[in-house]
A protein has these predicted regions:
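C-terminal luminal/periplasmic domains and tails of membrane-associated envelope-modifying transferases
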Residues: 1-4, 8-132
Length: 132
């Protein structure tokens, strides 16, 4: 998620002002495609937070690193390795869903993600995740 309702910095500072950086192991999301590239660590994350509907702070076509991954998880296709463990109702009808990764992502899931990024950015290798 990358909006004023939910983003990585909101999660990181969830207990402010009492505790700053409450979640020390959270990694920042790659919000802007051409600036940040593909988040290679995505496939190793133990927990994933996805908002429904997907949250953007810019045009969705400039934030495919948010949209493609979130849509793939929300669809549930080829990602049997994710277990929905908690949901939170946020402002403006947004639901934050917390998933726990129970195993590796399937080759089909990785291939689907790789193809979508390659189609969107054929000339930008930094946005071509490995399909494995």
């Amino acid at each position: 998620a990358s909006s004023f309702i939910m983003n990585w910095d909101i999660l990181r500072n969830v207990n402010m002002p009492d505790v700053r950086n409450a979640v020390r192991t959270i990694v920042f999301t790659h919000d802007v495609d051409l600036r940040d590239g593909f988040p290679d660590y995505f496939y190793d994350a133990s927990y994933i937070v996805v908002c429904d509907p997907v949250q953007y702070h810019l045009r969705p076509e400039t934030q495919r690193t948010i949209g493609i991954l979130a849509d793939a998880i929300l669809s549930g296709e080829d990602c049997d390795n994710l277990e929905l463990i908690k949901t939170y109702e946020l402002d403006e009808g947004v639901t934050a869903k917390v998933y726990y990764r129970t195993g590796e992502y399937s080759a089909a899931f990785k291939q689907k993600i790789a193809e979508q990024f390659h189609d969107a950015y054929p000339d930008v290798p930094a946005l071509h995740p490995a399909a494995e």
